Amino acid sequence: MSFTLIGKHEKDSRNNRDGYVTAMLDLMEKDSKVMHVDCDLENCINTGKLAKAFPEQTVNAGIAEANAMGVAAGLAATGRTVFMHSFGCFASRRAFDQAFMS
């Protein structure tokens, strides 16, 4: 079995962190209820741009992913749309225990 792809397929040269920040900037501009909870990664993954553009919609929870999950859950309970961002290895297990308990 064979098939042919139709169209021009080029590799997207943007990296994931820039895509995330661009999407978040767009969402935050369109909806003031969109919140970003950061785990002290503003310089590492370029989310500092979010804090500069929308300081009232950004929370830096520090190096405390479990606490960030609790903050995100609390904000969501008040009607906000929350995106909590951290590295996968730090946002797994213990931090999700916090989300489960919230």
How should these model regions be labeled?
Residues 1-102:
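Thiamine diphosphate
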